[in-house]
Every structure is written in C-alpha cells, then in structure tokens.
Design a protein with these regions (language model features):
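Hydrophobic alpha-helical segments
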Residues: 1-175
Length: 175
C-alpha cells in the first residue's frame, strides 16, 4: 500500500458503499453499479475487479455482468436496477446531468431515496476511484483467474485495507 493514510479512508468508503449491509440494495447490485460506471470510464482494472466481485455476490456467472455492461436495458435485471444504472450513467457524465425525470422514473420503479442517494454516491466515487487507478497507471494483470480470486476474497473479507494489500502481494508472488 503506497500511502496508508489515503488508502485506509478510500477502502473504508468502498466498504460502506459496496460491502456493508444496506437497507435494500444487495451487495451484488451495488457492485454492478461500480462495475458499470468503471466500464463507462474505460477503467479496465476497476471494471474487471468489480465485475468479478458482482459475479460472486450475485452467485452468477460473468455473462450476466457482461450483459449489464454491454446493454443494461436488455439485461435480465429488475426495472428498478435499470433505472438506477441510468442515473449512474448520468452521474458519470457529470453530476448536473442527472435529470428530474430519471429520479422520478427510478421512484416509479420502486427505488427509495436512499437507493437513489447511494447510486449517485457510488457512481461519483467510482469516477474518482477510476481516475485514481488509471492516473497512477496501476498494475493490471490480464488474467481472469486473478480477478476471480480477488472477487471471491472481497466477498468474504470486504474492503479492509489489510486484506487488499495481502491479496495483491500474494497475487504478485504467484503471477
């Protein structure tokens, strides 16, 4: 971990946004939002990492996640999640791009204020995380097994800084 004083709060934010209990959005749905925004930002590392985590959280295979990334409107997900992904896509373009009609539609599809809030926060946070990762030219393995192992570990352990550092250290030794 390059700077624990910055990595620790960033990991803590990811823990709250993506892993901790949520009143209504499952961890898999939140990971899909993170993966979707990362894909829109063309952040390979974050897209692949959070896609693998979503796969494990949803007890699915990667094909569902890939469908969401390619075309959320055609993916076999709830209308509410599709509406939340539309909001996330608008945030990715810029916060002021979120339209009142998108919020109204999400509410019509059953989204609560906390789900809308957290979708905006996840999308905004991942715009920052993606730029941070890409801006530092973060090491990015081109090995699906790496991402799959990391995904399974994040599901078990969350985003604690110590477990993230251990994962990357172990994977570097075996790659």
């Amino acid at each position: 971990m390059f700077r624990p004083e910055t990595a620790t709060p960033l990991c803590s934010l990811a823990q709250v946004l993506l892993h901790d209990q949520h009143p209504t959005l499952g961890a898999g749905e939140r990971e899909l939002i993170a993966s979707y925004v990362s894909n829109l930002n063309t952040c390979n590392f974050c897209t692949r990492s959070h896609s693998a985590i979503a796969k494990h959280q949803l007890h699915s295979d990667l094909s569902l996640v890939k469908q969401v990334l390619a075309d959320p409107e055609a993916a076999p997900i709830s209308e509410k999640l599709k509406a939340l992904l539309r909001i996330a896509a608008s945030v990715q373009l810029g916060g002021k791009n979120v339209k009142p009609e998108e919020i109204a539609y999400a509410r019509k599809e059953g989204a609560t204020d906390i789900e809308i809030h957290d979708t905006v926060l996840i999308a905004a946070a991942f715009c920052m995380y993606n730029r941070y990762v890409d801006g530092l030219a973060t090491w990015q393995p081109d090995n699906e097994e790496f991402y799959d192992k990391m995904g399974a570990q994040r599901v078990r352990e969350g985003y604690k800084p110590s477990s993230i550092n251990i994962t990357l250290t172990k994977e570097l030794q075996t790659s």
